[in-house]
C-alpha cells in the first residue's frame, strides 16, 4: 500500500502537521499560490489566440484582444480565464506531480478561507487525475486533535468558495487593467486604480479634506484646586454657570469668571456614590487583533498578520483570518477550567460569556485564540520576540473574555461656588475581574480616590488655573483605525484588510508619517476623477454590496458569472463615457492652475501642476506646438516636508492655526518654498479651487538644524542649499562640488562612495558597461552612459568577489558574502528599507528563492528577511 500525499501552502505548516501524521503520509508545501492570471501579455498568448479569429476584423476588437491577452481573463466570452504557473514555481509543481503519481490519495489541506480553497482547486487542476483521488481537509487550528478529526472526516472541494475567490480576482483585474490606462491618458503616466483600493484611498482623502476644512475654535477651561476641612486636596473643574454649560470662548470671558470664582464660597452640594462594572471585550477577530496590536504593541497591520501567520502555522493559535467571535465548546470548557484552577471561582462567571458576531460573519469559524491555554508566551522558544508578544496579547484577550466583570465604586462630587458648579469624579477598583489578565493601557482621569467629604462641607480655594484650548479636527486614520472603518462600512474581508492597507501605500496616493495617513495631492485628484466618472465603483455602499454578493456566491446563493456580468455591464458603460472628451461628460484632465509668476525662460505665466512626484510650477507654454513648447519647471519644496513630523495631541490643531486660509473657499492652504525670497500658498482644494497667494520675504530653508557637516572629500564645511529636486548640503569649497542629500527625517544622508567602473561587465541593452554606484538604497550597477542608457541591476556577489580589490573598504564585506544558496542558486545584493541595511538573497530566473543571508556581528548569517 502506497502513501497518501498531503499538500499545504507553507513549509512551516507542513512541518507542524507532519508531527501529527504517521508514516503513511507525505506532507509537502506548495509555498503559496502555484498559478495565477498572467503577469504579462506574452504569458497569456494562448488565451488571446483563442479569440483572435473572432476579433481580427475590426481595430476596436483587436485592441480588445490585446487587452484580454494582458488581463488573462475575457469578460466578453463567459469570463474565460487563462491561468499560468507562477514564475519560479515550476520545480514545486513538478515535484508535487511526481509525488501525486505515486500516492494512493491526495489530501488538500490548505487554509480554510476562500483563498485557501482557491489554492486547493488550482493544485487539483494542475496536478490533474481523477477527482476521486482528492479530498479536502480543513482545520481551524493545527493541533493533534484537530488534525485527527479533519482526516477522519475529509470533504470535497467547495467550488462555490473557489468561484467567489475567482469573481473577486476577476473584478479586481478588470478594474485595474481597464481604468488605469484611462488615468494614464487623462491625468498622468504610472497611475493605477483598484476596485477596493480606490475606495480605501477615498476614505483617507475625505478625512484629509475634513481636516483642511476644519477651523479650530478657541475655548477655555478653569480648574480649581481646593482643600477639604481635613486638609486633603480636591481638584475640581468648572462645568456650569447659571445652570448652563460653562465654555468661555476667549480670555476676557474666562478672566471675568475667574474674578467671580475668587470671591465665591465653595461647598459640597452633592455626593453620589454608586457601584459600576466593566465587562470584558470579545475574543479577537482579525480587525480587532490588528487594532489591539497597533495600540498595545505598536505593530502595523502587515506585521501583525505576519506574526499571527507564523503562530498559526506553528500550531499555537487558531486561524487568524476570521470575522467571527464564536468559540467552540471545547475552547470554552478549556478556558473556564483554566480560570477556575488558576484564579478561583470569583473570576469565573456562572455561565460562559456570549458575544454576538456580525450578521454576515462565518459562524463556522472561531475567534482567534490560543490552541492550548496552558501554553504561555515565554515557552514559545522557537518563535521570535514579536510573535511571543502577539501570542501573549491573544492569550490575555481569550482568557479575559470568559472572566467576570471588573467592579468599581464610582463617586461624583458636585460643588457650588456662587453662580458656578464644579465637579470631580473618582473611581476605585473594588474587584479586578478580567482586568487581572488584561490590564488597562493607562489609567483614566477618573481612576483616582476622592477625599471623604459630605454634602454641606465647606472647601477652601487654593488656586484657579485657566487654560486655553482649541477644538481639534477629526483624527487622522492609523492603519488599525482605517481597518476598523473598512470593517464598519463592510468593505473588504478579514483576508483582504492587510493587502488593502499595503496596496494604498505602495501606489503613492497616501503616505504614512508617525503612523498616521496623509493623502497625497495626486491621490486627491485621482479620487475626484474616479468619483465623477465611476460613481458606483467609488460608492461605499456599492462596494459593501459587492462583498455581500461574493458572500452569496460562496454560500451557493448566487451564480458567480451572473454577478460578474452585472458588474461588468454597468462598469463598461461608465468606462465608455469616461473615455470621451470632458465636454461630452468624459474624465477631466489634470489641469494646471495659472499663476502670476513669470517663466524665467520664456516669460509666459507659470502654472501649479501636480504629478505623481508632487506639486511643481510648470510653464504654460508646455501646451504649445513642439516648435514653441517651453518645458521649464520650478521645483517647490513643501512646507510639510521641511518641518518636523507632527507629534502630540494638539499638533494638528496648531498646524491648522498656523496655515493661511484660502480667500475663495476658506480651506487651509498648503505652503511651498519657491526660492529663498518667495513662498507660494496653494488652496488645499487645488486644482478644484484655483486660490493661491504669493508671499515675499526672506525665507530660511528649514530642514536641517543639526551639527556642522564636514565634507568627507575635502574637509570644508557643507551648507544647506535648495535645488530643482529639493534640499541638499553643498560643500563650500567651489573646487570640490561635493553634495549630500537631506533625508525625509531631516538628517543629512551618509556619504556615498565614488562610482567604481567595471568595463569587464557589459550592459545587455546597449554598448555601455556597468559602473558600481552607491545610492540611498544601497549599491547597484548602472550603465556608464547614464542618462543615455538607464539600465540598472543588482550586483551578483560573485561579481563583487571578482572585483574585490577595486571596492572601497566599507563595501568589501559584501564581496565576502555567500555566492550561492545550498541549492546552487546565485546570490545578489539587496537592500532592506526596513532595517536600512544590505543583505544577500538567492534568485533563480529573476525570482527570489526565499533564501537570504545577513551580516551580523562581523559575519554572514543565514536567515529570513
Curated annotation (Swiss-Prot):
Outline the segment boundaries, as ranges, of region: Interaction with DNA.
192-197
Specify where the region named Disordered lies, as residue ranges.
37-65
Catalytic activity of the protein: ATP-independent breakage of single-stranded DNA, followed by passage and rejoining
The record's annotation in Gene3D superfamilies points to: 2.20.25.10, 3.40.50.140, Bacterial Topoisomerase I, domain 1 (3.30.65.10), Topoisomerase I, domain 2 (1.10.460.10), Topoisomerase I, domain 3 (2.70.20.10), Topoisomerase I, domain 4 (1.10.290.10)
Name the InterPro entries on file: TOP1_Znf, Topo_IA, Topo_IA_2, Topo_IA_AS, Topo_IA_cen, Topo_IA_cen_sub1, Topo_IA_cen_sub2, Topo_IA_cen_sub3
Instruction: Extract the PROSITE patterns matched here.
Output: TOPO_IA_1, TOPO_IA_2, TOPRIM
Where is it found, in Gene Ontology cellular component terms?
chromosome
* EC numbers for this chain: 5.6.2.1
Which ranges carry the Toprim domain? 3-142
Q: Where is the site labelled Interaction with DNA?
A: 33, 168-169, 172, 177, 184, 321, 507
Task: Give the record's GO biological process terms.
Answer: DNA topological change
Q: Which cofactor does it need?
A: Mg(2+)
Q: Does the keyword Metal-binding apply?
A: yes
Q: How does it assemble?
A: Monomer.
Q: What is this protein called?
A: DNA topoisomerase 1
Which organism is this protein's natural source?
A: Salmonella typhimurium (strain LT2 / SGSC1412 / ATCC 700720)
Gene (UniProt)? topA
Amino acid at each position: 500500500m502506497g502513501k497518501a500525499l498531503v499538500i499545504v501552502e507553507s513549509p512551516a505548516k507542513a512541518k507542524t502537521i507532519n508531527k501529527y501524521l504517521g508514516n503513511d503520509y507525505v506532507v509537502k508545501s506548495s509555498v503559496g499560490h502555484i498559478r495565477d492570471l498572467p503577469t504579462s501579455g506574452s504569458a497569456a498568448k494562448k488565451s488571446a489566440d483563442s479569440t483572435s479569429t473572432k476579433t481580427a476584423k475590426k481595430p476596436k476588437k483587436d485592441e480588445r484582444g490585446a487587452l484580454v491577452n494582458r488581463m488573462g481573463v475575457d469578460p466578453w466570452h463567459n469570463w474565460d480565464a487563462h491561468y499560468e504557473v507562477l514564475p519560479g514555481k515550476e520545480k514545486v509543481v513538478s515535484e508535487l506531480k511526481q509525488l501525486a503519481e505515486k500516492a494512493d490519495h491526495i489530501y488538500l489541506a490548505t487554509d480554510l478561507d476562500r483563498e485557501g480553497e482557491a489554492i486547493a482547486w488550482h493544485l487539483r487542476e494542475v496536478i490533474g487525475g481523477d477527482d476521486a483521488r482528492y479530498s479536502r481537509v480543513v482545520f481551524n487550528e493545527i493541533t493533534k486533535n484537530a488534525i485527527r478529526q479533519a482526516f477522519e472526516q475529509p470533504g470535497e472541494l467547495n467550488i462555490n468558495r473557489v468561484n467567489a475567490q475567482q469573481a473577486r480576482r476577476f473584478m479586481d483585474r478588470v478594474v485595474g487593467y481597464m481604468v488605469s490606462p484611462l488615468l494614464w491618458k487623462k491625468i498622468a503616466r504610472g497611475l493605477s486604480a483598484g476596485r477596493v483600493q480606490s475606495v480605501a484611498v477615498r476614505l483617507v482623502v475625505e478625512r484629509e479634506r475634513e481636516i483642511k476644512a476644519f477651523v479650530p475654535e478657541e475655548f477655555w477651561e478653569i480648574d480649581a484646586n481646593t482643600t477639604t476641612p481635613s486638609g486633603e486636596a480636591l481638584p475640581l473643574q468648572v462645568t456650569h454657570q447659571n445652570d448652563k454649560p460653562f465654555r468661555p470662548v476667549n480670555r476676557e470671558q474666562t478672566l471675568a469668571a475667574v474674578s467671580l470664582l475668587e470671591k465665591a464660597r465653595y461647598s459640597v452640594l452633592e455626593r453620589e456614590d454608586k457601584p459600576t462594572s466593566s465587562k470584558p471585550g470579545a475574543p479577537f477577530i482579525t480587525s480587532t487583533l490588528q487594532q489591539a496590536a497597533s495600540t498595545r504593541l505598536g505593530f502595523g497591520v502587515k506585521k501583525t498578520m505576519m506574526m499571527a501567520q507564523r503562530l498559526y502555522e506553528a500550531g499555537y493559535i487558531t486561524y487568524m483570518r476570521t470575522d467571527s467571535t464564536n468559540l467552540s465548546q471545547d475552547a470554552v470548557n478549556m478556558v473556564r477550567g483554566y480560570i477556575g484552577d488558576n484564579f478561583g471561582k470569583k473570576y469565573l462567571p456562572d455561565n460562559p460569556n456570549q458575544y454576538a458576531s456580525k450578521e454576515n460573519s462565518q459562524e463556522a469559524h472561531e475567534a482567534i485564540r490560543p490552541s492550548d491555554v496552558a501554553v504561555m508566551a515565554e515557552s514559545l522558544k522557537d518563535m521570535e520576540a514579536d510573535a511571543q508578544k502577539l501570542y501573549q496579547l491573544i492569550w490575555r484577550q481569550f482568557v479575559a473574555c470568559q472572566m467576570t466583570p471588573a467592579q468599581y465604586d464610582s463617586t461624583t462630587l458636585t460643588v457650588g461656588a456662587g453662580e458656578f458648579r464644579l465637579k470631580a469624579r473618582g473611581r476605585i477598583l473594588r474587584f479586578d475581574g478580567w482586568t487581572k489578565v488584561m490590564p488597562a493601557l493607562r489609567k483614566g482621569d477618573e481612576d483616582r480616590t476622592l477625599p471623604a467629604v459630605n454634602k454641606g462641607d465647606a472647601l477652601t480655594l487654593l488656586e484657579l488655573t485657566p487654560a486655553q484650548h482649541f477644538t481639534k479636527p477629526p483624527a487622522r486614520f492609523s492603519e488599525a483605525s482605517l481597518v476598523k472603518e473598512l470593517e464598519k462600512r463592510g468593505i473588504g474581508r478579514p483576508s483582504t484588510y492587510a493587502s488593502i492597507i499595503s496596496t494604498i501605500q505602495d501606489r503613492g496616493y497616501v503616505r504614512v508619517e508617525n503612523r498616521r495617513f496623509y493623502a497625497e495631492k495626486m491621490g486627491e485628484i485621482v479620487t475626484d476623477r474616479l468619483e465623477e466618472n465611476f460613481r458606483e465603483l467609488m460608492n461605499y455602499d456599492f462596494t459593501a454590496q459587492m462583498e455581500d454578493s461574493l458572500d452569496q456566491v460562496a454560500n451557493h446563493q448566487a451564480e458567480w458569472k451572473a454577478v460578474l456580468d452585472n458588474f461588468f455591464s454597468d462598469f463598461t458603460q461608465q468606462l465608455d463615457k469616461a473615455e470621451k472628451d470632458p465636454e461630452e461628460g468624459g474624465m477631466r484632465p489634470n489641469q494646471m492652475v495659472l499663476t502670476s509668476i513669470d517663466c524665467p525662460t520664456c516669460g509666459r505665466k507659470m502654472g501649479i501642476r501636480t504629478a505623481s512626484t508632487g506639486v511643481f510650477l510648470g510653464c504654460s507654454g508646455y501646451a504649445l506646438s513642439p516648435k514653441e513648447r517651453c518645458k521649464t519647471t520650478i521645483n517647490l519644496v513643501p512646507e510639510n516636508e521641511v518641518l518636523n513630523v507632527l507629534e502630540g495631541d494638539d499638533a494638528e490643531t496648531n498646524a491648522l492655526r498656523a496655515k493661511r486660509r484660502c480667500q475663495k473657499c476658506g480651506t487651509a492652504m498648503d505652503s511651498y518654498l519657491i526660492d529663498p525670497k518667495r513662498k507660494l500658498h496653494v488652496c488645499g482644494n487645488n486644482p478644484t479651487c484655483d486660490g493661491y497667494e504669493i508671499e515675499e520675504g526672506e525665507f530660511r530653508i528649514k530642514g536641517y538644524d543639526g551639527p556642522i557637516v564636514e565634507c568627507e572629500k575635502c574637509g570644508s564645511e557643507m551648507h544647506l542649499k535648495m535645488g530643482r529636486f529639493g534640499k541638499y548640503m553643498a560643500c563650500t569649497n567651489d573646487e570640490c562640488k561635493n553634495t549630500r542629500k537631506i533625508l525625509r527625517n531631516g538628517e543629512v544622508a551618509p556619504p556615498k562612495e565614488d562610482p567604481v567602473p567595471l568595463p569587464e561587465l557589459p550592459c545587455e541593452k546597449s554598448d555601455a558597461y556597468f559602473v558600481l554606484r552607491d545610492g540611498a538604497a544601497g549599491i547597484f550597477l548602472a550603465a556608464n552612459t547614464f542618462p543615455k542608457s538607464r539600465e540598472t541591476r543588482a550586483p551578483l556577489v560573485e561579481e563583487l568577489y571578482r572585483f574585490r580589490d577595486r571596492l572601497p573598504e566599507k563595501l568589501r564585506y559584501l564581496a565576502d558574502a555567500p555566492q550561492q544558496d545550498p541549492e546552487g542558486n546565485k546570490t545578489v545584493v539587496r537592500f532592506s528599507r526596513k532595517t536600512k541595511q544590505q543583505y544577500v538573497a538567492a534568485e533563480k530566473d529573476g525570482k527570489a528563492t526565499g533564501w537570504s543571508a545577513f551580516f551580523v556581528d562581523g559575519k554572514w548569517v543565514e536567515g529570513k528577511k
